[in-house]
UniProtKB/Swiss-Prot annotation:
Cellular location(s): Cytoplasm, Perinuclear region; Golgi apparatus, trans-Golgi network; Cell junction, Focal adhesion; Cytoplasmic vesicle, Clathrin-coated vesicle
Domain C2 tensin-type: 570-708
Organism: Mus musculus
Sites bearing Omega-N-methylarginine, chain numbering: 1122
Catalytic activity: L-seryl-[protein] + ATP = O-phospho-L-seryl-[protein] + ADP + H(+); L-threonyl-[protein] + ATP = O-phospho-L-threonyl-[protein] + ADP + H(+)
Heme as UniProt keyword: no
Official protein name in the record: Cyclin-G-associated kinase
Active-site residues, as the UniProt record annotates them: 173 (proton acceptor)
Feature: compositional bias, Polar residues: 776-789, 805-816, 1111-1132
Residues annotated with N-acetylserine modification: 2
Compositional bias of kind Low complexity: 1084-1099
Keywords annotated in UniProt: Acetylation, ATP-binding, Cell cycle, Cell junction, Cytoplasm, Cytoplasmic vesicle, Golgi apparatus, Kinase, Methylation, Nucleotide-binding, Phosphoprotein, Serine/threonine-protein kinase, Transferase
Length: 1305
């Protein structure tokens, strides 16, 4: 009988396992199973386990293959475990690194032929187990570090998805055998039969029985080699939770790196003590050593969380410039590439191994033929079916190329990118259009629109006629009007319904799709630069491989939707010639080229310089440059292609030649300023370049151009003319606030300015009168960024300062849009969407929007000044001698007569130390219209200027009213002789309007009353300072001496007046007792002491006066050790005061030459010690206050002040470090010592002299990485800070390498 049974088993085929189980398995193969709407035919056995089989099944309708898991159970406990596995898989399905759940079904044991309950679980079919691929690769050598990084990162992403569930799902049986390789080459985690949501927290109250029960349950669901110390020894009372998956991941990483398990024998003692060893001589995987140690900690509390593991892997990937989400191509290449048919076919292990947890072990069987009885049992129908299956294997072997997962990526939840949806045979290597339709209909039923960017078309009915055909040409940037129209269309579709999504595709879902999606992200104001958008696309899908022209057109869109948009003009442009400097080396001898040019406008070729070979000029290196004359007028999208003409064998006789493309340039004329004469493109701005050796160093291409002054409107109005920018908000790109915050945390790094290697320049000459007529039509820049697209333009409009809205958050942008009016309709998406949150600037957490004008990195205009003169703007930097640019409070000044100060045309310096309250328009006879004292004058306001023009007494004094008032102003109340009329007279209206709008009035405390020298009192002060010479400004020494407050500081009460000796000065005399007016304007110049008197009591708190002295001869020195000439700055001779402000040391010496000065005699009285706050209300009005007591003066200071409120001080310190040195490896290394944390002594500062050659830079960079590498700071308080420094250095090093590792000189 046994012999007969063996014979039947032999005839049943090689798939038989023998006995009832084998017959059950064989009986199931070939059957048709219905799961929901799917009708599947079971084709063969893939694997078997303790109570489960895995089959390959094919959908009879679509031909798609699936993995069908058949689970058998005869116990209620097993039933619950199976149902739980199905529930977990269904809940976790959808993640790219977890096997996809499709369907499930079950029947009771009463209905089953096996007498057991049956459960069917349908999932996607993967290529095979990772173990088998690793074995094949490792036979040829160790696995590369990048491949291990991808494998482990994708595995951790799957575990992270499990741990993020509520409650967290713990896999408990993570091992390399449970990792599958998809047809696309990505990792898929499978087998959730051991997963649970229950955590255990043993303590001393647990009984031995309870510990034994828990240990038994855990042992049944885990693999011995991967068990954790807390599981092996429950009496350690460590918590048993998600950290057991971290331990298993550490074992997997160790196994991937060193091809052996850290606890190969599963010895409990070694596991409990964490005894494993990393090979000492390993240098290939050193980057993973610290990560392995951190994951294999005995105490689970000390192990890294899965989020920390993923973050460290991302940092390693960024440092190695690897996309960790990409397919593991090394495994696919070693195993036949993407074209392998079906999953890997491995030989079955002996007897089919089954572990203690009942997990499926590999038992794949090759079944190239069926058993003899299979044919007899199925009859002729089965025979022809098998023949049909065999004939279809050729197509199936090709169809498995990248099949199994659709090539579709979600940039956001509402923007998707995929490759071309193909039909027919082509669908074997591309997305099948039916699969795409089914996927989109299932996920976004009725709410998706497809945008086809490729020149090929297909039936729009496949996607319910919601297909937009764009037809963009390949290997060039799209036309601007087409790109802008596409962005408008996508925005309108997303606004219709908050459930709508946009699906964009070209042929491969790369360059063209990246341009469209990145431009749309910028159109919605998520980013303001192309670099940030392209980076997000690269991380969400793949590196797009775009050209500089693609990026240029994305920047065009950024400019057009900026806060102050730049609209392209409609002026034609004459391209005179193309100049290449130096001569490119395209000849066979590498000594020159024979170039010719083709120019396209849109799709039409407008000119070519191609001629017969001998008639085209050949340029040599000695020529220095190659010039191609053109003389063609273009407008709109311009494409210039430069070819090298090369003679072929026998070509001269046949008048034939071969052309070799050298490069091409594409741009839009609407963004070239009207006065540009030369457009310069660097080597990095050129498209379709050949090998770098053919382009000499500093190679650039210049277009000699001339922009016509008149507009030439196109036949059709461009789409941006009548487009309202209201309502553009980045939140339309997301489905909820959490998604937006996640995007900001990943891609919200502050956008970097343009890099030097990707900029071009524009030269221009003085504008002609015709050009000035159309001057206002030129696109204008709104940014102060030095690397702006139009930064170096010197247009006349730039007399008005640029007020770019730096760091404008989305919330601020929204408020601006709302403030524009209520005409914009709020979409349904915006009404139902999450509330907009303001983005807070950070080092790497948010995305502060840079100035709206920081665009067009590819083009910079270098334009000369126009013929129209420009009014100079007084800079605010340098020594502020008279406080002309300091800020102060605008306080109305009282009339001069109210203070009891007489009018005089001879008392030149009486108002030198008057309070600001004593200011009034001078009476007749005042030489310069003395209206305010030199030092204490109140600042001017625009209102004061208007009052002067209207003949009224101003509330505040304008120190430069004589300079600003017109000479023909007959309404001025002064009738005094105009002694300085010739050089003080100017047109006030022209002068005021010539200044920028933000400087229409002088700065608040621009006190220039040194020319207002009238109104000097005659009576000397009742208190005489102990000085042998008159010292008008002697009290200033007190400032320098007492700048640092001491214990003897004397508080100054409100309204108290101090002399230079520190004693309170009595109030001034009655106005009736003052000296009468003198006729000689300079008579009292030598009797200065007589012009000093007690000042009125209206002086602000903290005021003081200089020390007057008895009358001296006219030739007696009156100021000791003063500067040589009036108007120059000087420092009073006093004892050193290191902390004194520099502004307190620079003043005007109004009168007195060198020969008139003598030796200063010190005062007999002790000088007072006052605090720095005693003159708080005095100094701000005169420009002598410290800068830290004033508000920010510049936009940069305002941004820093805003950052300081919400940002970590360490991040602020890092931002200050990289400011102005973004991606400049030399600058960052030479200043690295300024940002290192306290106690770091391994780094020795380096200078620029140590960073001249690329070798020196590389050496210092490696030293710096050893110091700041985050792995060396694990667990330290400065760990996060070290990570930020490391990332900045790494970005700078990558940029240094991308630019060719050039030497400094």
């Amino acid at each position: 009988m046994s012999l007969l049974q063996s014979a039947l088993d032999f005839l049943a085929g090689p798939g038989s396992l023998g006995g009832a189980a084998g017959r059950d398995q064989s009986d199931f193969v070939g059957q048709t199973v219905e799961l929901g709407e799917l009708r599947l035919r079971v084709r063969r056995v893939l694997a078997e386990g303790g109570f489960a089989f895995v089959y390959e099944a094919q959908d009879l309708g679509s031909g798609r293959e699936y993995a069908l898991k058949r689970l058998l159970s005869n116990e209620e406990e097993k039933n619950r475990a199976i149902i739980q596995e199905v529930c977990f898989l269904k809940k976790l399905s959808g993640h790219p690194n977890i096997v996809q759940f499709c369907s499930a079904a079950s029947i009771g044991k009463e209905e089953s032929d096996t007498g057991q309950a049956e459960f069917l679980l349908l999932t996607e079919l993967c290529k095979g187990q990772l173990v088998e691929f690793l074995k094949r690769v490792e036979c040829k050598g160790p696995l590369s570090c990048d491949s291990i990084l991808k494998i482990f990162y994708q595995t951790c992403r799957a575990v992270q998805h499990m741990h993020r569930q509520k409650p967290p799902i713990i896999h408990r049986d993570l091992k390399v055998e449970n990792l599958l390789l998809s047809n696309q080459g990505t990792i898929k985690l499978c087998d959730f039969g051991s997963a649970t949501t229950i955590s255990h927290y043993p303590d001393y109250s647990w009984s031995a029985q309870k510990r034994a029960m828990v240990e038994e349950e855990i042992t049944r669901n885990t693999t011995p080699m991967y068990r954790t110390p807390e599981i092996v020894d429950l009496y350690s009372n460590f918590p048993i939770g998600e950290k057991q998956d971290i331990w298993a991941l550490g074992c997997i990483l160790y196994l991937l790196c060193f091809r052996q398990h850290p606890f190969e024998d599963g010895a409990k003692l070694r596991i409990v003590n964490g005894k494993y060893s990393i090979p000492v001589n390993d240098t290939r995987y050193t980057v993973f050593h610290d990560l392995i140690r951190a994951m294999l900690k005995v105490n689970p509390v000390e192990r890294l969380s899965i989020a920390e593991v993923v973050r460290q892997l991302q940092e390693i990937a960024a440092a190695r410039n690897v996309n960790p989400k990409a397919p593991i191509t090394e495994l696919l290449e070693q195993n036949g590439g993407y074209g392998n048919s079906g999953p890997s076919r491995a030989q079955p292990p002996c007897g089919g191994t089954v572990n203690s947890s009942g997990v499926l072990a590999l038992a794949e069987y090759d079944q190239p033929y069926g058993g003899f009885l299979d044919i007899l049992r199925g009859g002729t129908e089965r025979l022809f079916t098998n023949l049909k299956d065999t004939s279809s294997k050729v197509i199936q072997s090709v169809a498995n190329y990248a099949k199994g997962d659709l090539d579709i990526s979600y940039i956001t939840s509402r923007i998707a990118v995929m490759s071309f949806p193909a039909e027919g045979v082509e669908s074997a290597i591309k997305n099948n259009i039916e699969d795409v339709r089914m996927f989109l209909d299932a996920k976004h039923p009725g709410h998706y629109a497809v945008y086809n960017l490729s020149p090929r078309i297909y039936r729009a009915s496949k996607f319910h006629n919601r297909v937009t055909e764009c037809g963009w040409a390949v290997r060039r940037a799209p036309h601007l009007h087409s790109l802008y129209t596409l962005c408008r269309s996508m925005h309108a579709w997303l606004r219709e319904d908050h459930r709508n999504v946009c699906v964009v595709h070209c042929m491969d879902g790369r360059a063209a799709s990246a341009v469209a999606v990145c431009a749309f992200l910028c159109f919605c104001r998520l980013f303001s630069t192309a670099e940030a958008a392209v980076y997000m696309f690269s991380m969400k899908r793949c590196p797009p491989g775009i050209w500089p022209s693609h990026k240029r057109y994305i920047e065009y869109v950024c400019d057009m939707v900026a806060e102050e948009p730049i609209t392209p003009h409609s002026k034609p442009m004459l391209v005179k010639s193309v100049v290449m400097t130096p001569v490119p080396l395209f000849s066979k001898q590498r000594n020159g080229c024979r170039p010719f040019c083709e120019v396209y406008v849109g799709e039409e070729r407008v000119t070519t310089t191609s001629q017969e070979y001998d008639r085209m000029k050949e340029f040599k290196i000695e020529d220095g440059k190659a010039v191609i004359p053109l003389g063609v007028t273009v407008q709109g999208d311009v494409l210039i292609i430069i070819y090298h003409a090369r003679a072929t064998l026998g070509g001269r006789l046949q008048a034939k030649m071969a052309s070799m493309k050298m490069f091409q340039i594409q741009f839009h004329t609407g963004f070239v300023p009207r006065n540009a004469t030369t457009v310069k493109f660097a080597k990095y701005d050129l498209d379709a370049c050949d090998i770098q050796e053919k382009y000499p160093d500093l190679f650039q291409v210049n277009l000699e151009v001339e922009v016509e002054p008149r507009d030439r409107p196109s036949r059709e109005a461009p789409p941006w003319e009548n487009t309202s920018l209201r309502g553009l908000n980045p939140k339309i790109l997301f489905s909820n606030r959490e998604e937006q915050q996640d995007i900001l945390s990943k891609f919200g790094k502050p956008e970097l300015p343009r890099q030097p290697g990707s900029t071009a320049q524009y030269d221009a000459e003085a504008g002609s009168p015709e050009a000035e007529i159309t001057e206002s039509d030129s696109p204008q820049s709104s940014s102060t960024d030095t690397n702006h697209f139009l930064h170096t333009l010197d247009w006349q409009e730039e007399k008005e300062p640029e007020t770019g809205l730096d760091n404008t958050s989305p919330k601020e942008s929204q408020s601006v849009l709302i403030a524009d009016g209520d005409g914009s309709e709020v979409s349904d998406e915006e009404e139902a969407s999450f509330p907009s949150e303001e983005r807070k600037p950070g080092a790497g957490e948010d995305t502060p929007r840079l100035a709206a004008g920081t665009k067009q990195q590819d083009l910079i205009f270098d334009v000369g000044m126009l013929a129209a003169p420009q009014e100079p703007v007084q800079p605010e930097e340098g020594v502020d001698l008279l406080g002309l640019h300091s800020e102060g409070d605008l306080r109305p000044a009282a009339p001069l007569q109210a203070c009891g100060v007489p009018s005089s045309n001879t008392d030149l310096l009486s108002c030198l130390l008057e309070p600001s309250d004593a200011a009034q328009v001078g009476p007749p006879g005042d030489l310069l219209g003395g209206e305010a004292p030199l030092l204490l004058a109140s600042p001017v306001s625009p209102l004061g200027l208007q009052n002067n023009l209207q003949g009224k007494v101003p509330d505040t004094v304008d120190p430069f009213d004589q300079f600003l008032l017109s000479s023909n102003s007959d309404t001025q109340p002064c009738s005094k002789p105009d002694l300085f009329g010739e050089f003080l007279n100017s047109d006030s209206v022209a002068s005021s309007t010539a200044f920028p709008s933000t400087h229409s009035a002088p700065p608040p405390s621009c006190s220039t009353a040194f020319l207002h020298l009238g109104d000097l009192p005659a009576e000397p002060s009742k208190v005489i300072a102990s000085s042998s010479h008159p010292d008008l400004l002697g009290g200033w020494d007190t400032w320098a001496d007492t700048a640092t407050p001491g214990p003897a500081s004397i508080p100054v009460p409100e309204g108290t007046l101090f002399s230079s000796a520190g004693h309170p000065a009595p109030p001034g005399p009655n106005p009736s007792q003052t000296k009468s007016q003198n006729l000689d304007p300079f008579a009292d110049l030598s009797d200065l002491s007589s012009s000093l008197q007690g000042l009125p009591a209206g002086l602000p708190a903290g005021g003081f006066v200089g020390a007057p002295a008895p009358t001296q001869k006219s030739n007696s020195p009156w100021q000791a050790n003063r500067p040589t000439a009036p108007g120059t700055s000087w420092t009073p001779q006093a004892k050193p005061a290191p902390r004194a402000s520099e502004q307190l040391r620079s003043h005007f010496s109004v009168i007195g030459a060198r020969e008139e000065r003598g030796v200063r005699v010190p005062s007999f009285a002790q000088k007072p010690k006052v605090s720095e706050n005693d003159f708080e209300d005095l100094l701000p009005n005169q420009g002598f206050s410290k800068s830290d007591k004033k508000g920010p003066k510049t936009m940069a200071e305002m941004r820093k002040q805003e950052l300081a409120r919400d940002t970590d001080p360490l991040k602020l310190k890092l931002l200050d470090w990289i400011e102005g040195k973004e991606r400049n490896i030399r600058a960052l290394l030479s200043t690295l010592h300024t940002v290192l944390w306290d106690g770091e002594s391994r780094w020795t500062p380096v200078s620029m002299a140590d960073l001249v050659t690329p070798e020196q830079v590389k050496k210092q960079y490696r030293r710096a990485v050893l110091v700041v590498h985050p792995d060396k700071a694990t667990g330290q308080p400065y760990e996060q800070y070290a990570k930020m420094i490391f990332m900045e250095l790494n970005d700078a090093w990558s940029e240094f390498e991308n630019q060719g590792s050039r030497p400094l000189f």
